[in-house]
């Protein structure tokens, strides 16, 4: 199992979820030691990671770049779905993007 992503309310209520059954999110992530990454490197493949409204615009920019740089077609396709999910959450008060690691 991969790193699932969900939009959730501040109470933790699930609004929408994207499953990563083929472990594709990790193919878009930089190394944890990559200091040029502001958000993506902190997605924990084995734990939970939450991005708030101040972080989401930066996350979206980084994700677009990761998708553009990828050569893995399945990862690109999944990244596009993840991007749409993040954009849906962006700008919505008390709404978060949560990643649930394996």
Which role does the model predict for each range below?
Residues 1-102:
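Acidic (Asp/Glu-rich) sequence patches and key acidic residues
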């Amino acid at each position: 199992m991969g790193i699932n992503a969900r939009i959730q309310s501040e109470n933790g209520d699930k609004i929408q979820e994207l499953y990563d059954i083929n472990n594709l999110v990790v193919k878009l992530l930089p190394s944890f030691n990559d200091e040029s990454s502001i958000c993506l490197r902190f997605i924990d493949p084995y734990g939970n990671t939450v991005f708030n409204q101040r972080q989401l615009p930066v996350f979206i920019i980084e994700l677009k770049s990761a998708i553009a740089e990828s050569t893995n077609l399945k990862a690109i396709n999944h990244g596009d779905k993840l991007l749409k999910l993040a954009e849906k959450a962006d700008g919505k008060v008390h709404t978060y993007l949560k990643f649930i690691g394996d």
